[in-house]
Regions:
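Conserved small-residue motifs centered on glycine
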Residues: 196-304
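Alpha-to-beta junction loops
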Residues: 122-134
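Helix-loop-helix "hinge/cap" segment bordering the ligand-binding cleft or interdomain interface
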Residues: 1-46, 68-115, 119, 178-192, ...
Length: 305
């Protein structure tokens, strides 16, 4: 576990070591991230600024549009403008430190995601953002470029800024919202049937297992509590890589393991697709990070807007 300042110091040391070993030059950067530039950053700094901001209790990057940029302060039960706070200055001071010491590549904010990924695959950079779906792809590509046994990937926790909270506390991430027009369109009896189906599909163990893994015996099996796909399938969305050319992606081919379904359920189901190293990552989250108080519905004043 570490703070952003400590993390920056470690990366400065890693850069120095890589220079000494001839792995990179003084003017090279060892961190050139994806999800921040022209492909998916939307001109807002994307994922990296979102994670950095969450560590300092501010909304920035992808989160800048959340509640008009306002942050919920549970202690005062009010929304505050994080962009004028000392926390905002602290977050961007760390960012400046990383750039000035030639650790974080300024091209992070302008390059496309493929450019960032290819730098990582070739071993030119040492750190990269990831998620459950992307990790299997990244691992396979690094192995293809560098060769098995010539590298090691390790998931780190997002460093601590002014809090040890996990990143997300918004009420909307994955799920379903139903318009009031549905009742008018379907009538009461059919509307009740639909709501019963929705309740089963999104909130029962059986429905969530179906939407995540498919049909037991056909797309997956369970042995001693361990879930695995049948030989004909792989799934990038579950971080289960392709091992033969005749396999098809469970999500792309059949629509299972889609994000709007699969991020809820009991702990056993939530972790059923995780390899050992990712289970360790989640265990460390539970040990070192706290859950934020959920935000109430935002209702900013005209002046705040």
């Amino acid at each position: 576990d570490w703070t952003w300042d400590e993390f920056a110091d470690v990366l400065i040391g890693v850069k120095q070591y890589m220079v000494e070993q001839g792995m990179c030059g003084e003017n090279d950067y060892i961190w050139s991230d994806m999800w921040c530039g022209q492909t998916s950053g939307y001109g807002q700094g994307g994922n990296l600024l979102k994670l950095l901001g969450a560590s300092y209790d501010i909304n920035t990057g992808w989160a800048i549009t959340t509640n008009y940029g306002l942050v919920y302060d549970a202690d005062s039960d009010s929304f505050v403008d994080g962009s004028v706070s000392d926390k905002y200055k602290q977050a961007y001071t760390v960012l400046q430190k990383l750039v000035q010491n030639k650790v974080l590549d300024p091209e992070t904010w302008t390059q496309d995601d493929d450019t960032a990924l290819n730098k990582f695959y070739r071993g030119e950079t040492a750190i990269m953002s990831t998620n459950r779906a992307q990790y299997a792809v990244q691992d396979a590509k690094v192995k293809e470029q560098l060769g098995e046994g010539n590298y090691e990937l390790y998931r780190i926790l997002t460093p601590i800024g002014t809090s040890d909270y996990q990143a997300e506390n918004q009420r909307l991430e994955c799920g379903i919202m139903i318009s009031s027009n549905a009742l008018n369109a379907l009538g009461e009896d059919e509307f009740i049937k639909m709501m019963r189906f929705v309740d089963w599909l999104w909130y029962s163990d059986e429905g969530l297992t179906l939407t995540k893994w498919g049909k037991e015996g056909e797309t997956y099996t369970v042995t001693d509590g361990a879930y695995s796909l049948t030989p004909g399938y792989y799934c990038k969305g579950l971080s289960i890589g392709q091992t033969s050319d005749d396999q098809v992606d469970l999500r792309e081919e059949l629509g299972y393991a889609c994000g709007n379904f699969m991020y809820s359920g009991n702990t056993e189901l939530l972790t059923s697709n995780l390899p050992e190293n990712l289970r360790d990552f989640y265990d460390r989250h539970g040990q070192y990070r706290q859950l934020r108080t959920p935000e109430p519905a935002g209702n900013p004043t005209k002046k705040q807007k």
